[in-house]
Amino acid sequence: MAEGETKSPGPKKCGPYISSVTSQSVNLMIRGVVLFFIGVFLALVLNLLQIQRNVTLFPPDVIASIFSSAWWVPPCCGTASAVIGLLYPCIDRHLGEPHKFKREWSSVMRCVAVFVGINHASAKVDFDNNIQLSLTLAALSIGLWWTFDRSRSGFGLGVGIAFLATLVTQLLVYNGVYQYTSPDFLYVRSWLPCIFFAGGITMGNIGRQLAMYECKVIAEKSHQE
């Protein structure tokens, strides 16, 4: 190289802190999008289970009824799922109690299956009265928490989610947005809080698993650097 020539500066590299913040923001956005679409999908599936009571096949009128129902329900469920799924690992970090119970995808998928089963039971199983149905679903929902979560923060958030979601649903029904066929608890069905509680636990488990995967990826990248 000649004496008069100067070495051109290479591309500017971001510091480790900026790179970490950027990657965390991107991962947070990706987790939110994934949770949103999972919530939308579950909302469509559970809506089908509620509509097709005593229907074993999928006739055209049942399929059409999914898309003719209120269009805003799946996006609202997706948004709520994203918020819940991001909130659970955030609360775990702030409490300093990382959730380590049954942290694998097979357990998460079983939790989703049990949640769908609880919803299916609410639509298909006939009881003598609604109190028996509500108590049974409450026991199943608490059993879901005990089997797949067992954290105090998870139980507390599940109860809070059930209360807020039931309150919002009551306000929507009261204002005539939609209605239940046989309301027995302040314009809604008495088993509804159990469904919301189980849904909060399920989305929390999915959010925790996604957050754990993100931590593994970040740790591997920092180790390579």
UniProtKB/Swiss-Prot annotation:
Residue numbers bearing the Cysteine sulfenic acid (-SOH) modification: 215
Pfam family, one: INSIG
Keywords: Cholesterol metabolism, Endoplasmic reticulum, Lipid metabolism, Lipid-binding, Membrane, Oxidation, Phosphoprotein, Steroid metabolism, Sterol metabolism, Thioester bond, Transmembrane, Transmembrane helix, Ubl conjugation
Function: Oxysterol-binding protein that mediates feedback control of cholesterol synthesis by controlling both endoplasmic reticulum to Golgi transport of SCAP and degradation of HMGCR. Acts as a negative regulator of cholesterol biosynthesis by mediating the retention of the SCAP-SREBP complex in the endoplasmic reticulum, thereby blocking the processing of sterol regulatory element-binding proteins (SREBPs) SREBF1/SREBP1 and SREBF2/SREBP2.
Protein name per Swiss-Prot or TrEMBL: Insulin-induced gene 2 protein
Family recorded in the similarity comment: Belongs to the INSIG family.
Biological process terms in GO annotation: cellular response to insulin stimulus; cholesterol biosynthetic process; cranial suture morphogenesis; inner ear morphogenesis; middle ear morphogenesis; negative regulation of fatty acid biosynthetic process; negative regulation of steroid biosynthetic process; roof of mouth development
Cross-link (Glycyl cysteine thioester (Cys-Gly) (interchain with G-Cter in ubiquitin)) at residue(s): 215
Modified residues (Phosphoserine): 151
PTM annotation: Phosphorylation at Ser-151 by PCK1 reduces binding to oxysterol, disrupting the interaction between INSIG2 and SCAP, thereby promoting nuclear translocation of SREBP proteins (SREBF1/SREBP1 or SREBF2/SREBP2) and subsequent transcription of downstream lipogenesis-related genes.
Gene source species: Sus scrofa
Keyword Transmembrane helix belongs to the record: yes
Compartments where located: Endoplasmic reticulum membrane
Site (Required for the recognition of 25-hydroxycholesterol): 115
GO cellular component term of the entry, any: endoplasmic reticulum
Record bears the keyword Repeat: no
InterPro entries: INSIG_fam
Transmembrane segment boundaries: 29-51, 71-88, 104-126, 130-148, 154-175, 190-207
Membrane topology, record value: Multi-pass membrane protein
Positions occupied by motif KxHxx: 219-225
SUBUNIT field: Interacts with SCAP; interaction is direct and only takes place in the presence of sterols; it prevents interaction between SCAP and the coat protein complex II (COPII). Associates with the SCAP-SREBP complex (composed of SCAP and SREBF1/SREBP1 or SREBF2/SREBP2); association is mediated via its interaction with SCAP and only takes place in the presence of sterols. Interacts with RNF139. Interacts with RNF145.
Cytoplasmic membrane side: 1-28, 89-103, 149-153, 208-225
Domain comment (free text): Binds oxysterols in a pocket within their transmembrane domains and interacts with SCAP via transmembrane domains 3 and 4. The KxHxx motif mediates association with the coatomer complex.
Lumenal-facing ranges: 52-70, 127-129, 176-189
A single MF term (Gene Ontology): oxysterol binding
